């Protein structure tokens, strides 16, 4: 029983076979996105059953009534017209306002403690940590490539593992600056609720706060050529002490 529960409640930070729901949230914005999705689904289910009930009632009434048209002199109904006009408008308002609020909050960049510059290439990612210098007084930077199947270690995820992961401290406001060196790419990591297009010659940015340790995978989400599927993203969240130790090793 314990084995079943442990397997059932394992944190899902990567795509899995037959997965039909979101990956487990690892940031406040992803938690907000999941909550918004669930709220919208609540309204959609009500609309689905309400409209379905009306349609079924009309069909049954048409079949069971000898005279399908109960009142041939009825040209309009003010009450029903008000209902089917005002009700959808109220539902749209209930959906739109939380959506606009979340969109605004996600666009805000909180005062960051750390900045990471990301540049997309065909077909790999380049990272820079402009806040830190290595032993040669140069900015910490590296490239991140897909690990081929022949070099995968036991337990590693195919088409998702990379040779150099992005290491970030947990519970720290991080700003990502995203650009491209060739064609349009898109930097996305579902568990963190982030997706930012990378345009050549243009800088986009977003902010993220990872609220727990873990390894989070993403992929380029803009078709960018023949090896588009070979641009995985691996972000590893560690404690501040481990992050500082990693910096000293670079």
Feature map (PLM): residue ranges:
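Non-transmembrane, membrane-proximal soluble domains of secreted or membrane proteins
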Residues: 2-39, 59-250
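Alpha-helical transmembrane segments
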Residues: 37-62
């Amino acid at each position: 029983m314990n084995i079943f529960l442990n397997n059932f409640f394992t944190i899902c930070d990567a795509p899995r076979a037959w997965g039909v729901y979101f990956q487990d949230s690892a940031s406040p914005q992803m938690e907000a996105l999941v909550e918004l999705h669930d709220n919208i689904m609540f309204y959609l289910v009500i609309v689905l059953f309400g409209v379905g009930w009306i349609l079924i009632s009309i069909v049954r009434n048409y079949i069971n009534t000898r005279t399908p048209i109960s009142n041939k002199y009825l040209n309009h109904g003010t009450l029903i017209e008000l209902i089917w006009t005002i009700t959808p408008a109220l539902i749209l308002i209930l959906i739109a306002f939380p959506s606009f609020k979340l969109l605004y909050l996600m666009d805000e960049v909180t005062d960051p403690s750390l900045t990471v510059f990301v540049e997309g290439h065909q077909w790999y990612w380049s990272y820079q940590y402009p806040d830190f210098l290595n032993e040669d007084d140069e900015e910490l930077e590296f490239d991140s490539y897909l690990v081929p199947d022949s070099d995968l270690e036991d337990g590693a995820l195919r088409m998702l593992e990379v040779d150099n992961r992005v290491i970030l401290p947990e519970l720290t406001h991080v700003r990502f600056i995203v650009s491209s060196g060739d064609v349009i790419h898109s930097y996305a990591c579902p568990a963190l609720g982030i997706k930012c297009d990378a345009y050549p010659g243009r800088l986009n940015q977003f902010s993220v706060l990872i609220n727990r340790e873990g390894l989070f995978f993403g992929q380029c989400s803009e078709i960018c050529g023949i090896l588009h599927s070979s641009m995985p993203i691996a972000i590893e969240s560690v404690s501040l002490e481990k992050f500082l130790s990693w910096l000293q090793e670079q």
